[in-house]
Amino acid sequence: MESFIIEGGHRLSGTIAPQGAKNEALEVICATLLTSEEVIIRNVPDILDVNNLIKLLQDIGVKVKKLAPNEFSFQADEVNLDYLESSDFVKKCSSLRGSVLMIGPLLGRFGKATIAKPGGDKIGRRRLDTHFLGFKNLGAHFGRVEDRDVYEIQADKLVGTYMLLDEASVTGTANIIMAAVFAEGTTTIYNAACEPYIQQLCMMLNAMGAKISGIASNLITIEGVKELHGADHRILPDMIEVGSFIGIAAMIGDGVRIKDVSVPNLGLILDTFRRLGVQIIEDGDDLLIPRQDHYVIDSFIDGTIMTISDAPWPGLTPDLISVLLVVATQAQGSVLFHQKMFESRLFFVDKLIDMGAQIILCDPHRAVVVGHDNAKKLRAGRMSSPDIRAGIALLIAALTAQGTSRIDNIAQIDRGYENIEGRLNALGAKIQRAEVC
């Protein structure tokens, strides 16, 4: 098992650029299954979840070529559908949540798919009902295979229809869109997710010959087509990594520039950090985070405690609540964090409390942070990363802490962050990757 050994207290300075967006990468890579022609994808993040998905596509016969660092060519002209029946496929899907995004393309193009229980972060009940109901609305039917613990989904013909999603699921919306591009007639999806990841997927599919309108809204219309062709697509910068770097720069930075962040696609991220008192200077498509020894949390107009909560896009992404919470531990003032979309992502705060943070965990969804105003530094400690986002939050805490910390189970961090120790060490951090028993 690998761990990070972090020597805290070192100021970071310099320039850093975000990787490609993980969530978009998983979607658009799966979308290459929709055509037999070559699809080129650029700015692909070199992270565990994406690399495992690429290997899984290769296993089912997709031809993958690495054209350059972070650039790949995909051609799905000889897909081996028999591999879906193998125990190896089920095993790999069970360790990779992104594998669920293969269902829509396989169903749309080939009329069949296998649904194995996907893996990923253990952060509460992440239902697949939205996916199932969407496929059923298009005319698919399901059957459970007990001895393999999977569902098989088939459709002789997909037919477009109107559907109102029970939740604005990002992966559910993406999956339904990818299946519906080949459905006969018109598909209308209301209460669709509209994150930049979905927008990018729709724009790539349109470049491949799909007919999708309503992009960037929660009402998406898809006119079915007979086939799609190749395309050349570039993945957006990862907004979650941008937010993570803002948090690091605010707490332990000595002047950090974050390059090429795609400001128009950051939504409420910048404003939310500013509500915590963090100074952010926008310079074109770059962000400059100056050194800030003190930052003061805003309060509401009536003087009540600031509340920060997540919401479906264009609300604040839930993936940054963990980072924002760590930043608040050294701010001046108090703030209530309300994690509405997942019910166990705040449980990692026990580790921050052990490090000296003043946090009251009200329930699985809410935590109050009373900031130290940098008067009392966090203490170093040993901890384990429960998921990707808590992992990076704990890494930020360890960078600011006095002494040397150890974070175990860093494979969780590797799932979402590319060479994070090397990139932060280039700014002055002291992070060592070590093999431990």
Regions flagged by a language model, labelled:
Residues 1-437:
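Short, structured segments at the rim of ligand-binding sites
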